[in-house]
Amino acid sequence: MNGSQTLVVKLGTSVLTGGSLRLNRAHIVELVRQCAQQHAAGHRIVIVTSGAIAAGREHLGYPELPATIASKQLLAAVGQSRLIQLWEQLFSIYGIHVGQMLLTRADLEDRERFLNARDTMTALLDNRIVPVINENDAVATAEIKVGDNDNLSALAAILAGADKLLLLTDQQGLYTADPRNNPQAELIREVHGIDDALRAIAGDSVSGLGTGGMGTKLQAADVACRAGIDVIIAAGSKPGVVADVIEGKPVGTRFHALETPLENRKRWIFGAPPAGEITVDDGAVDAIMARGSSLLPKGIREVKGDFSRGEVIRIRNLTGRDLAHGVSRYNSDAMRMIAGHHSQEISEILGYEYGPVAVHRDDMIVS
């Protein structure tokens, strides 16, 4: 690709630590050098970094990872400042400033806050500042976490209007099987569509330490590709990997972006972490998947989670398979009350109504 590109580089815990209990500074120095080189060439670079808890554990001398959430958040609070200091220190060698963005799921599932985050990202990039993004582990609980930095990086790529998303890992890419216990495993070079067979392969493989395995990388690739962003999974240890991706050289596993990407609002719907989920019956599945219809309350069998009207929810069939993401017309309490009922009963049950559908087709993205 000619001209300036926007590249999001995601570095997981296994890449930043080399599988040890400490940050691998020599490796981080080399990756910063590669990113700075592309920044100097006119490209826009975004970093999505793990490692706050590892940095905190190293600084405080914890011999192993504590089990309690409070202790992990303590380490994240200590480590986050040291982590951003490290990124600033290393990029400053090349005369580059960084800007920290700490996000939680709440920043991304709310449309207005999502747009505010996008404006911040744009301002940083327009001023030639490298955004350094991480989940706000010091305050994030299970209920407000995105969950892993793979999916966070896909959302960051959407926020940045990126051309490419590079997921650096401790493997060469996505294999047909786990190469560490199957010598017949082969590297998958090109992916033009993510199907159930590929999901099954990724679900059985892991990527070093941290919360993100190959399954979460595949989820991230699905979100980003639907937004028109190419995704590359490659080894962080490969020399010149950042330049290779910018220049379009074959490296790792490349997931090709959809030729007709989703429009901006639907990118948010598909990428936003769901605030809850609903299970629907076979009739609703047929209406959504075969006829392209809205979801009516009659087809809802179960409602999980606590969500507000206007938040993104996941829609699943009776076997638990993901069907779609959509914006809920009713909050979770109201959805439970009207589930299984005909649309004309909504007003009588609730005393009000926001229309006959639970999720409108225009506010829905099929998985």
From Swiss-Prot:
Pathway assigned to this chain's UniProt record: Amino-acid biosynthesis; L-proline biosynthesis; L-glutamate 5-semialdehyde from L-glutamate: step 1/2
Binding positions for ATP per the UniProt entry: K10, T169, D170, T211, G212, G213, M214, G215, T216, K217
Entry keywords, A to Z: Amino-acid biosynthesis, ATP-binding, Cytoplasm, Kinase, Nucleotide-binding, Proline biosynthesis, Transferase
EC number of this enzyme: 2.7.2.11
Gene Ontology CC terms: cytosol
GO molecular function: ATP binding; glutamate 5-kinase activity; RNA binding
Catalytic activity as recorded in UniProt: L-glutamate + ATP = L-glutamyl 5-phosphate + ADP
InterPro entries in alphabetical order: AceGlu_kinase-like_sf, Asp/Glu/Uridylate_kinase, G5K_ProB, Glu/AcGlu_kinase, Glu_5kinase, Glu_5kinase/COase_Synthase, Glutamate_5-kinase_CS, PUA
GO terms (BP aspect): L-proline biosynthetic process
Location relative to the cell: Cytoplasm
Main location: cytoplasm
SUPFAM superfamilies: Carbamate kinase-like, PUA domain-like
Function in brief: Catalyzes the transfer of a phosphate group to glutamate to form L-glutamate 5-phosphate.
PANTHER family reported for this sequence: GLUTAMATE 5-KINASE, ISOPENTENYL PHOSPHATE KINASE
Annotated family: Belongs to the glutamate 5-kinase family.
Protein name per its UniProtKB record: Glutamate 5-kinase
Species, as recorded: Serratia proteamaculans (strain 568)
Organism lineage string: Bacteria, Pseudomonadati, Pseudomonadota, Gammaproteobacteria, Enterobacterales
